[in-house]
Amino acid sequence: MKSQSQATPITGDEIRKAFLDFYESKSHLIIPSSSLIPDDPTVMLTIAGMLPFKPVFLGLRNRPSPRASSSQKCLRTNDIENVGVTARHHTFFEMLGNFSFGDYFKKEAIQWAWELITDIYHLKPENIIISVFHEDHESEKIWRDNIGIIPERIIRLDEKDNFWSSGATGPCGPCSELYYDFNPEKGLKNIDLEDGDRFIEFYNLVFMQYNRDSNGMLSDLKFKNIDTGMGLERMAQILQKKTNNYETDLILPIVKEAALIANIDYFSSDDRTKISLKILGDHTRAIIHLISDGVVASNLGRGYILRRLLRRMIRHGRLLAIKDDFLSRLASIGISLMQNTYPDLKNNKERILREINIEEKRFLETLDRGEKLLNDLIRSGEKLISGTKAFELYDTYGFPLELTKEILEEKNINVDLEGFTREMEAQKERAKAASQKIDLTLKGSIEREIDLFDQTIFEGYDSLNSQGIVKGIFFESNSVEKAIQGQTVQIILDQTSFYGESGGQVGDTGTISRNDAEIDIDKVIRKKNIFLHCGTVRKGEICRNQLVETRVDKFNRAKAESNHTATHLLQSALKLIIDKSVSQRGSLVGFNKLRFDFNSPQPLSKEQISQVESLVNSWISENHPIEVKNMDKDDALKAGALAMFGEKYGDIVRVVDVPGVSMELCGGTHVQTTSEVGSFKIISEIGISSGIRRIEALSGQLVLDYFKERDETVNKLSDLLKARPSQLFERIDSLQTELVNKNKEIQRMKDEIAYFKYSSLSSSAKKIGSFSLIINQIDGLDGSSLQSAALDLTSKLGDKSVVILGGIPDTEKKKLLFVVSFGDDLVRRGMHAGKLINEISRICSGGGGGKPNFAQAGAKDIDKLNDALEYARKDLWEKLLSYSDK
């Protein structure tokens, strides 16, 4: 045991360091925190300290060491409604953990946990309560006999509380939890561990000793494991003697900064105000780590979680009467608090603040209008808001559904979630119909039988031609014995030279043949590493179990290889020219072009595009070799190889390396030297969603074809405009100036025509007391001319005039225009042109708006024009009469 003279760790940094130092002294390998974006496609975010070790626990990856310890950053949003409300709920938190992979077990785990909390953290035994699984007599005995915990301090709980499992089947085991008792003077009778004011669970020891089969039966694991977790924020609350986690040195500086911005004092604030301040403190830590780890705000996946947190912060800022931008101030405090432990925060600070500012400005642009709609819904008195309205808030004003629910629930109003889902699905269907994507889904018996086949051996890295045995044939989604002439089929071989579509690269084209039979292959789909060769039988027939020849189209393969290598070079260039945080969000390596999606908060400038293009072309001309090797995954990542987020990799990975330029995990095909790419040209750069940009580019012969086509276009323009290519800009500029002058002349003539049409109207104005009223139909005038006419007439008739004009600007287009103009006297009396024009245009299936003194609208139903003008005449006649009587 260590001497208790050692100083007690107090600050969050000291508590974290003491934990890791302690377990390092027990021969644990200290593992740095993994990203919040896990290397596990089944999980969106790192939600637990053990998640990075999940492949080790499941036997899918070699253990880094028999013993390990870490401080892992984690993020959960399942209890987001409790954040700031309770003393201990968070989205972002740090989990301190020690792990054993088939090494030590219960005795050591319990002894070391006790040594840590009593000798290092100096917690008093009388403040500690232990819980155990009621059937785990072994753990209870260790606590009682080895540690000396009296039976009254050991609480037996059932499987719901003290038995961990990874799912319905698989590794599982009992756990033992350590609780801190804030009020030990209340005694040990009738202890209720659910009493959150008295007890806090701060250390959980999981003893992974069983495997549960599909029948629910438990059997002993060959290797027993230890998985523990201690919440850093909870231990800080205990050691710093705070009433909640938010008042520890880990979060309070952010909370105080938020209070300073809001010009209030945290400690003297009421509970509702404190909740908003705590939410800002919690969410700040979450957003800076999400952005630093590469997440960009969007409406999908992790990006949606980030956007939801950011917009929730802005909303709580509004509740604190903060109107201006403020999130970057909180983020700066959060970064300064954590940058020593997480240096990436300091390195990525500029990008973090930029992303926050962009998203904050984006939401503020629509926040006022969205809040107005929300307030209208609340004032309506309805207790169930339609899914249509909730979707409008989401789609038009950027309110995440959860934020809308949260705001309305504060007023005891519910949201029609099924209706919202229907609206969302309808939007997806509209998008799907518009995109006209090719369906490569496996259907029918293919989907059912695919698992019956062995994985296809791919031989296409070294040769475009090979032999393989036909293992399966599918026609119209059904398994058949042979493929005959004219049929479109899917063929499965035991081995092939065809590349199957994956990693963004399209599948090869070519032929499968045998004697006089031949199949034209137009695409190859990969499903669970089984290759389906899709094509049409051009002649003869091919049967199952026959030996066939595979011949890949070398020209298409060469174009794909060129585009794939160019894609790797492009990503490296973007990281150097734009920002090192740029990472791939999607790609397509085709025969005729390449497409690369990446995170960027703003469009690339023309200069940046030119720099990226030039850098890629310089690497091409330098004739770098392409080195391909298989490596241990961890070694490859340590060497700097880039991995695609969300991709699942095995222990051994294929690495494509352009030494000194690019290094990526990649299963695709590539050229042998960069000079084989030939040349590179970016043809477009666009935004495809919030924070995500897309580059389309060409390489090799396709670049020459592109310039040839442009040259032909330039020559045609030269002939058309009767100017040499070098004079085209000058000629076009001259034509544009000419066009502007012609348009001005046309508008002048329109104004003259309009004047002739309306000039006589002022003399026919109806007098109602001291007021003048003109309501008339004038056809053939566009919106600008109709507006000029109304304003000119109002000016002539004075501040007690009303002018309403409606007409058909173009009989072929069959639409209506309306304008309403009020004199100043009528505006002072409360009349509003915008409101009136809405009523008028609605009669003709239209709509519009404007200011109190002037408004305009459009409409579709030209047959209702007279009805609309008559409605206006009657309405205004009565109002003007009432004003004249006063």
Swiss-Prot record:
GO terms for biological process: alanyl-tRNA aminoacylation. InterPro entries: aa-tRNA-synth_II/BPL/LPL (IPR045864), Ala-tRNA-lgiase_IIc (IPR002318), Ala-tRNA-ligase_IIc_anticod-bd (IPR018162), Ala-tRNA-synth_IIc_core (IPR018165), Ala-tRNA-synth_IIc_N (IPR018164), Ala-tRNA_ligase (IPR050058), Ala_tRNA_ligase_euk/bac (IPR023033), DHHA1_dom (IPR003156). Binds 1 zinc ion per subunit. Its EC number is 6.1.1.7. Keywords: Aminoacyl-tRNA synthetase, ATP-binding, Cytoplasm, Ligase, Metal-binding, Nucleotide-binding, Protein biosynthesis, RNA-binding, tRNA-binding, Zinc. It catalyses: tRNA(Ala) + L-alanine + ATP = L-alanyl-tRNA(Ala) + AMP + diphosphate. The keyword Nucleotide-binding applies. Transmembrane segments: none annotated. This is Alanine--tRNA ligase. It comes from Prochlorococcus marinus (strain MIT 9515). The lineage of its organism: Bacteria, Bacillati, Cyanobacteriota, Cyanophyceae, Synechococcales.
